[in-house]
Amino acid sequence: IYSDIDLSNEFPPLKEVNKTIRKLSLAGYSPLKFVRIDKKEEYARRYDKAVGGGKGVFRQVDREESLIHLMRVNLLKRMESSIHSFTLTVSKLLNQVESLLSKIDDHDSDLIDALNIEELQDIELESTELEQFMIGNKTKVLLQDMDLIRFKQELEADKIFLSSIVEAAKGVTAQRDAKLELLKQTIAAKVRNPLNPDNKKVIVFTAFADTAQYLYSHIAQWASLELGIHSALITGGGTNKTTLSGLGIDLNNILTTFSPVS
């Protein structure tokens, strides 16, 4: 079932949003891309991996580039799932960008002696004392080894793009959520006109737990008041819920109650 995103038609067209997403550099996820030329070999020796018995090299910088492509696709999947999930993700990305920009502005290389990435042990890379002087999660890069001007420029560009997306997405409240409204209409039609006598069961599958939680929070009470039916939320994260009092949150209990035959 195809659905628009915004009942008010104020959210940008999907093509426009997709173009904006494709413009994102997501620089924070590719720190090796911004390592200075005179330092690239040091990082290659630390992070690149030999493959095929030494016949080839799996470059970490290529892995980061692939990750960025996957993240762009994931953003579109999040938007396809629900505007709520999409808003959470782009807001998180925006916060990460702002945090990195603050770290760059606060960076002072004079506070510490020059470091060499090859001489640092893994345990040192996780040190809280060094955290302010580097970025990255699994792949650590020292700020002193980066082209911070170019890195900051790409982060600032991402901040502009992400800010515009977040502002538009936050405007699509549950009251304006076209997909949520269509789902309610579909559920109501199924309950009021069941294919089989007295079969009012409706199962909604989603790939993302936060979408499931969002749907439950806006459908459960409505379904009870408008349709006289109970609802349950089942996720893999242990956040199960149901409108049936006294049932608890045990997965098997909920499934048995809502579908005793199966």
Predicted regions and their residues:
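Donor nucleotide-activated moiety binding/catalytic core segment of transferases
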Residues: 262
